[in-house]
């Protein structure tokens, strides 16, 4: 039938995928995969062509609920979800509520709506898979953050997994600095008692360039979650690295620009006041609001880099050809963290993300 990948991977199908991810409390990694898939499909600017940070947050906060009681934030596993009908139940309920575009083409040559009609999935069972009308959580599972620590609006929080610390949707904490994940793991092993209530752990130099390769940090987040539960404290974590879908807690990833290229996260110092404000969808370092302090710290960082052959000494070791290629060519997480020579993002046969008449709306909300 001469169906090509670009017939299937379109602006509308990518938007559908993001909405499904929100509705199941999915991994923060969706905001790495989606921009890179969009680029491979010909869209050069994810924010302009597919979905802006502002629209993403509006949908997550006001339109799309979480409709599964699933680990790591809930009770049930993917096996349980599959036993209740799986993803087709979720997609049908989202589509019936007005949240998904059913006109997108699928690999069966049917539209999404035609495919769901043929499969005729059951209604949500109400225990494992909830409905949009009576959701598990009222708001979507993900939130993108801006602010002076994330001017690219790349930072992402898995809101569905937050267990505490957001009184009135605001976290106010003290920065605890760790240059590299191993430094944090060593501290958690040897002296975990140093962490106090409302600490904000900063793990940096783990981004696409700094890692290099943006390594996953499930080990760190799992240990911090255990620490918090055992000591009845709130400890948050922020990093220019990334997390597994299994992470829970107040953890913020993909902060960019990353530390290895001199992003604001590199300029945070021990004890700085860090505010996460979900009313504004921002993460800010209060001392860096002072332009003189920002300039002084940036000059100090640059001096360190200049005295180390152009690379900060805290970056990870690029000891293979692939890792060295990543160090020299990786772009920011907000663009998918892929490798592009000269960090000039390559898009083959670019196309425009023309808007359709479909607008996601929840018929159960006014």
Question: Can you name each region flagged by the protein language model?
Answer:
Residues 1-234, 238-258, 263-366:
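Catalytic or ion-coupling anion/metal-binding cores of large enzyme and transporter domains
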């Amino acid at each position: 039938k001469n169906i090509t990948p670009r017939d299937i991977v379109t602006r509308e199908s990518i938007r559908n995928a993001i909405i499904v991810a929100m509705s199941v409390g999915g991994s923060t990694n969706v905001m790495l995969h989606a921009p890179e898939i969009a680029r491979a499909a010909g869209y050069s600017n994810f924010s302009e062509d597919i979905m802006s940070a502002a629209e993403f947050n509006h949908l997550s906060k006001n339109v799309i609920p979480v409709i599964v009681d699933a680990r790591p934030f809930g009770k049930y596993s993917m096996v349980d979800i599959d036993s209740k009908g799986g993803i087709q139940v979720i997609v049908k309920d989202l589509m019936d509520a007005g949240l998904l575009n059913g006109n997108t083409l699928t690999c069966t040559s049917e539209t999404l709506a035609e495919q769901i009609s043929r499969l005729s999935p059951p209604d949500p069972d109400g225990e494992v898979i909830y409905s949009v009308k009576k959701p598990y959580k009222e708001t979507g599972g993900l939130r993108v953050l801006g602010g002076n620590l994330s001017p690219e609006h790349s930072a992402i929080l898995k809101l569905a997994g937050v267990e505490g610390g957001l009184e009135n949707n605001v976290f106010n904490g003290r920065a605890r600095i760790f240059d590299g994940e191993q430094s944090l793991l060593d501290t958690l092993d040897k002296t975990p008692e140093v962490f106090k209530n409302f600490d904000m752990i900063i793990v940096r130099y783990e981004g696409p360039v700094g890692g290099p390769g943006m390594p996953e940090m499930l080990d760190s987040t799992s240990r911090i979650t255990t620490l918090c539960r055992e000591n009845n404290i709130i400890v948050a974590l922020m990093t220019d690295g990334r997390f597994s879908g299994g992470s829970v807690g107040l953890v913020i990833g993909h902060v960019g620009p990353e530390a290895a290229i001199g992003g604001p996260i590199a300029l945070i110092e021990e004890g700085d006041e860090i505010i996460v404000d979900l009313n504004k969808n921002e993460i800010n370092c209060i001392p860096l609001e002072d332009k003189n302090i920002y300039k002084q710290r940036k000059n100090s960082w640059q001096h360190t880099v200049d005295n180390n052959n152009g690379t900060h000494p805290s970056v990870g070791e690029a000891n293979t050809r692939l890792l060295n290629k990543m160090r020299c060519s990786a772009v920011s997480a907000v663009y998918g963290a892929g490798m592009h020579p000269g960090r000039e993002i390559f898009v083959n046969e670019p196309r425009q993300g023309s808007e359709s008449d479909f607008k996601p709306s929840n018929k159960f909300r006014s």
